Curated annotation (Swiss-Prot):
Homotetramer. One of its GO terms (cellular component) is cytosol. The keyword NAD does not apply. Pyridoxal phosphate-dependent enzyme that catalyzes transamination between primary amines and alpha-keto acids. Catalyzes the transfer of the amino group from gamma-aminobutyrate (GABA) to alpha-ketoglutarate (KG) to yield succinic semialdehyde (SSA) and glutamate. Thereby functions in a GABA degradation pathway that allows some E.coli strains to utilize GABA as a nitrogen source for growth. Also catalyzes the conversion of 5-aminovalerate to glutarate semialdehyde, as part of a L-lysine degradation pathway that proceeds via cadaverine, glutarate and L-2-hydroxyglutarate. GO terms for biological process: arginine biosynthetic process via ornithine; gamma-aminobutyric acid catabolic process. This is 4-aminobutyrate aminotransferase GabT. PROSITE patterns: AA_TRANSFER_CLASS_3. The gene is gabT. Coiled coil: none annotated. SUPFAM superfamilies: PLP-dependent transferases. Changing I50Q: 3-fold decrease in catalytic activity and 12-fold decrease in affinity for GABA. The modification N6-(pyridoxal phosphate)lysine is found at K268. Its cofactor is pyridoxal 5'-phosphate.
Amino acid sequence: MNSNKELMQRRSQAIPRGVGQIHPIFADRAENCRVWDVEGREYLDFAGGIAVLNTGHLHPKVVAAVEAQLKKLSHTCFQVLAYEPYLELCEIMNQKVPGDFAKKTLLVTTGSEAVENAVKIARAATKRSGTIAFSGAYHGRTHYTLALTGKVNPYSAGMGLMPGHVYRALYPCPLHGISEDDAIASIHRIFKNDAAPEDIAAIVIEPVQGEGGFYASSPAFMQRLRALCDEHGIMLIADEVQSGAGRTGTLFAMEQMGVAPDLTTFAKSIAGGFPLAGVTGRAEVMDAVAPGGLGGTYAGNPIACVAALEVLKVFEQENLLQKANDLGQKLKDGLLAIAEKHPEIGDVRGLGAMIAIELFEDGDHNKPDAKLTAEIVARARDKGLILLSCGPYYNVLRILVPLTIEDAQIRQGLEIISQCFDEAKQ
């Protein structure tokens, strides 16, 4: 049997250091909210492969659907020989993505591809080249999505300048002194100083920032952004790669914002652990790209498509949207109880089950505590709980449990978090 230490040594020789690894363990098998490493140790998984496992590890209905598809067809490339699961999934997404208008859907493989294609479609539809993204944003690791991403280190450090015609607005974050008025004013400054509105093809926004710290836009801000886009003929792109697929208590977070985007990207949990992503948008906008301008060899792979179709059925059969809201409330209640004993927890927040806590030195919001955050992650792992951090200051703990988690596992995870804070304080 290989140990984690031995595998980590082999990893350093075989895999470039640019591929980070948060936890120095190697997973061997998993079930719902539990993971076992190669040494047989069991962990509670509160990371979900970075928001990919809303239906848990290896949901039996998803596994059964995938096994059945594997016996029929694994790949043809949809642009060469089409297959029904791709078409069926697109038809369903056209109905489920927010917006009371005709829609079409493109399937790809990764969230980065989805965002990049959304911008490409917006540029084709508007005949413009500029894009506005936000501070703290994370949109992917391809060259263009790195330009959209509002954090240089570690994502694009040492790579030189990214593609141009990307402009940075402020994401509203009252906790850190950025009001909604500040955010809107920053867009108007772009229009005045950097790029005229008639040169902007799209504004790309995460309704709840993922890597940026789980800060959620308010419906009021999103409505102001929608009005601004309408005024200037700009496409509004909602990046729901992390917030979508039911994480926030609705299938898409934009359903809670009171307005619809022109284009929506999705990925991560949509296929229960299989690589699938997509863009859904206004039909006439999606048709702006000429034949041959969209697609990819593996885009919308049939195995991933049937997995996604089954995931959507599981959401309905197991009432997972309501469970996301119930689960989120249980997590927030438990974390708020911990925060009462630990003033270093300066904020507990989240939509649905997309929950985060933010840590500060002595509760001072001007002193983000990245060191304590990293310590809590490490202590939790030692106690059998997998957590992730995020945020521009590396001081946010995010919780991305499966929506299928058992109540006893929630209590166990919260107890471990509480113990970690108690011990770190000693």
